[in-house]
């Protein structure tokens, strides 16, 4: 598209030949501030002196060679935006990002544009570059221990699950602090090493097969069912997926490896067309709806207009940075968007004089939303960036408290408080409602819910099969079994040994009927579709419990207009109900047969006004 990224190298001095500037394709210029080991050492001494502390050991030089190869000691210290064509007089007064380094030249800290430290790293005293701890701002520190070969043997999470890793020649055993164990069996060497078998904490086993170059060929689940994948020999792109029941999906690509066609297991096809530049120009959905994309700039991959299946056109304009500036709908009504220098949307101006304004703090977090009438909603955050409070325009305050891992432990709305408790795995184990009643939860070793005791003291239990599907539920003695076909679609449900509901599907996998018993009578809803997979009919039937004789039926048919929108509903023995629409499908009125029922008048935002 003609976009160019230019790198500027220092012509002379201690940074000679190093990249110290970048100009992106939109014309913005970024200055890369570099430092040497000597500069960092001097800065550390000055900082210690100004703080009245004893300077720590910070050598002026480093070895020319380390375990990782040649090292000239030069590091990136900060990135500044120094030229912005859209905001030439409003450049940031601080760097976009800043980095801190250890005396050995290891990355120690990352600071965002507000000068808030967002990441920190700690390294082994003996082994250069071996990270032994890291943390995100406001979160606990995660620590690591290593064996003599430099492999992680422990991951220590003070407020969550910790893990140990045991390495053997062809398998790795992972055990968490709840004593759950997984074993990963591997084959191959170097970059071709792959996990071919996984023993899960419940004893189940899943397996994977790969071709000679390490691409996935097949996966076998815990029930022994295999899904096959067929990658293209040259590109490696998946061309076919065959599920355990023998159904297949196919994928086709052009010479740019872009998807041009995808056929699902039901035989319906998605098609895409591209121009010479690789831009999407047309997409045909499985139901036949066509969306077209138009471009007015040969140097942009962003569309200037889209035409939907109804023929309605929506146009867009974009900034040089790819930010959406305007959207004009099918009726010619325009919505405009404003952005700040960081690319965040600051205002949306809609028809009817409606605008919404957004404000952000120095970290880029949304702190206020105000409408045209001056009604303002404000937002507050903690150091980790979790949303802690929403203050409505009337001054009412809804708050949320979090644990150290960022999980909500208490929410307050309208003066009422709800609290949550978690186990070490981060699973909710106790929920306390606004009136002080409790619901408790229990899980199996694969984190699946197996028991729930509600506010009323009633206990429900759940059982799953090897692949995780619910197969049995118990509700205070009421036992329900769930049954599935080879494609994992539910086929029937039994309650106390009696069939309660049944689901039927056709050869394409579409639902064709749901039935249940009501006072001994079989009540069924049958579904019919056209070749595009759209619902065309629903027929309800009631059969005699002994003779299966048809006692009652009622059918409703559905029709679509030439643009693919549902526009008619035709009940038995009644005139058709028709929806009248305009544009992309906005409802303008309804009629029963030839008799108008209702008309809608809409404003420039397509809202009902009459």
Residue ranges with predicted function:
Residues 1-610:
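Extended charged/polar low-complexity repeat regions
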């Amino acid at each position: 598209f003609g976009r160019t990224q230019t790198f500027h190298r220092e012509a002379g001095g201690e940074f000679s030949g190093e990249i110290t500037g970048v100009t992106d394709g939109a014309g913005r210029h970024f200055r890369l501030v570099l430092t040497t080991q000597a500069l960092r050492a001097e800065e550390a001494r000055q900082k210690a002196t100004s703080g009245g502390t004893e300077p720590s050991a910070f050598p002026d030089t480093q070895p020319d060679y380390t375990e990782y190869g040649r090292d000239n000691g030069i590091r990136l210290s900060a990135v500044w935006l120094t030229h912005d064509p859209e905001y030439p007089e409003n450049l940031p007064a601080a760097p976009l990002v800043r980095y801190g380094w250890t005396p050995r030249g290891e990355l120690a800290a990352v600071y965002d544009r507000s000068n808030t430290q967002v990441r920190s790293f700690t390294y082994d005293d003996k082994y250069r570059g071996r990270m032994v701890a890291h943390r995100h701002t406001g979160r606990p520190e995660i620590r690591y221990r290593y064996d003599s070969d430099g492999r992680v043997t422990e991951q220590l999470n003070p407020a969550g699950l910790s893990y140990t890793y045991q390495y053997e020649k062809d398998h790795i055993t992972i055990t968490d602090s709840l004593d759950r164990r997984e074993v990963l069996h591997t084959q191959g060497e170097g970059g071709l090493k792959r996990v071919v078998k996984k023993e899960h904490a419940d004893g189940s086993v899943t397996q994977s097969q790969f071709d000679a170059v390490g691409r996935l060929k097949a996966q076998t689940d815990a029930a022994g069912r295999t899904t096959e994948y067929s990658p293209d020999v040259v590109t490696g792109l998946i061309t076919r997926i065959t599920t355990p029941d023998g159904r297949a999906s196919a994928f086709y690509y052009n010479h740019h490896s872009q998807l041009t066609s995808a056929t699902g297991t039901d035989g319906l096809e998605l098609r895409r067309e591209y121009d010479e530049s690789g831009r999407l120009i047309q997409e045909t959905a499985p139901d036949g709806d066509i969306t077209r994309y138009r471009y007015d700039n040969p140097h942009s991959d962003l569309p200037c207009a889209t035409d939907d299946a109804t023929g309605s056109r929506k146009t867009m304009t974009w900034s040089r940075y790819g930010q959406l500036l305007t959207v004009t709908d099918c009726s010619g009504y325009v919505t405009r968007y404003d952005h700040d220098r960081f690319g965040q949307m600051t205002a949306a101006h809609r028809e009817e004089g409606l605008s919404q304004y957004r404000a952000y703090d120095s970290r880029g977090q949304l702190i206020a939303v105000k409408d045209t009438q001056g009604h303002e909603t404000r937002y507050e955050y903690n150091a980790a960036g979790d949303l802690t409070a929403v203050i409505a325009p009337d001054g009412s305050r809804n708050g949320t408290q979090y644990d150290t891992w960022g999980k909500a432990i208490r929410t307050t709305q309208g003066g009422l408080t709800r609290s949550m408790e978690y186990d070490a795995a981060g699973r909710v184990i106790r929920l306390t409602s606004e009136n002080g009643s409790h619901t408790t939860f229990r899980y199996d070793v694969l984190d699946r819910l197996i028991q729930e005791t509600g506010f009323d003291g009633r206990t429900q239990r759940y059982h799953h099969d090897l692949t995780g599907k619910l197969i049995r539920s118990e509700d205070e003695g009421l036992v329900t079994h769930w049954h599935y076909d080879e494609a994992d679609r539910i086929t029937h449900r039994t309650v106390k040994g009696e069939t309660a509901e049944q689901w039927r599907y056709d050869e394409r996998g579409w639902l064709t009927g749901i039935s249940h018993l009501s006072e001994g009578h079989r009540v069924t809803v049958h579904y019919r579709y056209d070749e595009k997979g759209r619902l065309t009919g629903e027929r309800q039937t009631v059969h005699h419990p002994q003779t299966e004789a048809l006692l009652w039926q009622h059918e409703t048919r559905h029709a679509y207009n030439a643009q693919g929108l549902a526009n008619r509903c035709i009940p038995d023995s009644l005139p058709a109900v028709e929806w009248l629409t305009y544009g992309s499908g906005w409802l303008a009125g309804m009629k029963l047969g030839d008799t108008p029922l209702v008309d809608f008048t809409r404003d420039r935002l397509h809202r009902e006004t009459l």
